[in-house]
């Protein structure tokens, strides 16, 4: 059981009280004309063309700029904001850099920034380590497998829309913000951030240039103990981040517009603290020797560095249709923490640091036609190429052993995974038809062709042995090419019960190509005379990686009358295969076992008298794989957790306050690994100085200083516990922290 059982019960009572309160003192419902505006005023672009929410037969949430900025300035990350706002999006793990296992409806989502995919051939889970919240205009979340985007959208789409000059007031304006945060647990428990932007908006031209920076200090848990360093996916403690972003748009005429945008993002950890393994790694045999110590030095540190260019062109009159064109380029380098490897009889144990590079090119073209007032058709093509390479820094084991794992100096570099090139070409079409004044039908089809090229590769451990001089040569594991194709379909219907209420149902398919880099390039070798002879291997010719197809179903209801809003849905998704991460080798394995995820999600809010508003959200989810004796619980390494959240807010012309909480329910899998339950509360607020156009934001996070293991920490114990004692991977969340910031608009 978790360590917050009483807190969970209290929190459930807190949410129930909110729920009953929402119906007790609500204002009178808005009039009918206001109600129509409430449902139809929000337009989302997460699909292939802009659509009103009222036309879409699926669950959609929009987190607007005001909420994102208020929460971020009060000390929350984007992952935390979305995890507390989107019912079916898993909770964030405070302090973690990774988003691994932070699923949407129990499956990985496709993350987009202005429509450009942040997902790659290598599933690195750094998609949110990509942008400062200062630069975000809104986030659109489309839940469930998405046929129209196809690959790697089995959980849905999270589309991050950045701020542009066209969204600003006319003329030249500027904005600056600065803030700090601390839990006051030690002299290095201090975070700070600053950002600034200049915007220009005229009749034809618009532009925005911004820079945002952040530096974090030490992280402490609820008991006041320095958090253990995350040697698996790394944390954001002792981290420096910079996000430089610019865009320029030109309105050619009433119908045509072109826009260019670019970004440079760098997030790097540089810590004086490391995981102490004991003298000459004695803690691997005696886990009691593991501890966090100062004096850590390494010439290789965790980092996410990304550059991105994006150009879009729209023409509202191409033979009576709207043309949408987009071209994008993204390059990134992702580095991890030095990590132990068992090696083989020649290399012995060694430490390596993983560095993985991706170059992504994408082109998207779509035409939007409206042959009749009732029919809208969007059709087009996509093409993209993803090139991936990986290498590993090998460290001096003498220096590392003498320091107990606190001193890592590179002695050479070798390959880590085979190089992977994934090329995709797809055609798609989707239609929306207003069958009656109240009934809208939706349907779509996508045909996708994927070519994967895998390079020849010498096993990673064998390359290390050659570097060490303990071997002279090795056979290569053969690469090759493999092609995939899939036809994906979607169909749905939305029925408007009243001008403020809708019911909808949807079927959609998703396509997923599991991580090829961690699947290929694994071989068994024999060793003789300094040469490694390949005995057998996982390669393209003998055991090509199989794709996974997912069918997703949902029914839902939404209501928004301007005072009360509610959205709820039940869903079921079934995939034909399962992905397993080998606990000893960390290799990806594809298993011919069906995997299903089903659940119910909901979110409700109401505006009350005297400036109060309250809301609740919840998600009940089950993830199962099919075994010989029927369905059984999936591993906590990837299965989603159920959650319940709520808030009470109050605002007047100047001051706003919000007290919120979230309870994470315990989850145990078939192997008895557990994600413990916990409950967290936050208090955030802001005060606006109208005369100076300045806003003061503040926040208290983890108000009751709860000591808990994050969801990622529980997952990491299940995933990596075969390599070292599970205590090494028990990543806890931060204790009580305070944050304050000041924002000035010119």
From Swiss-Prot:
- Pinpoint the TBDR plug domain residues: 52-163
Q: Which residues form the signal peptide?
A: 1-26
Q: How does it sit in the membrane?
A: Multi-pass membrane protein
Chief location of this protein within or outside the cell: membrane
Q: Which keywords are on file for this protein? A: Cell outer membrane, Ion transport, Iron, Iron transport, Membrane, Plasmid, Receptor, Signal, TonB box, Transmembrane, Transmembrane beta strand, Transport
Q: Which SUPFAM superfamilies match?
A: Porins
InterPro entries registered for this protein in UniProt: Plug_dom (IPR012910), Plug_dom_sf (IPR037066), TonB-dep_rcpt-like (IPR039426), TonB-dep_rcpt_b-brl (IPR000531), TonB_rcpt_b-brl_sf (IPR036942), TonB_sidphr_rcpt (IPR010105)
| UniProt key word Membrane | yes
The cellular component terms of Gene Ontology attached to this UniProt record, alphabetical and capped at eight, are: cell outer membrane
Membrane-spanning ranges: none
Tell me where in or outside the cell this protein is found.
Answer: Cell outer membrane
**Which ranges belong to the motif TonB C-terminal box?**
729-746
Which part of the chain is the TBDR beta-barrel domain? 169-746
**Looking at the keywords, is Iron present?**
yes
GO molecular-function terms, A-Z: siderophore uptake transmembrane transporter activity; signaling receptor activity
Q: Where is this motif: TonB box?
A: 40-47
Family label:
Belongs to the TonB-dependent receptor family.
Function (record text): Receptor for the siderophore rhizobactin.
NCBIfam families in UniProt:
TonB-siderophor (TIGR01783)
The protein in question is named Rhizobactin receptor
Give the classification, highest ranks: Bacteria, Pseudomonadati, Pseudomonadota, Alphaproteobacteria, Hyphomicrobiales
- Report which gene this protein is encoded by: rhtA
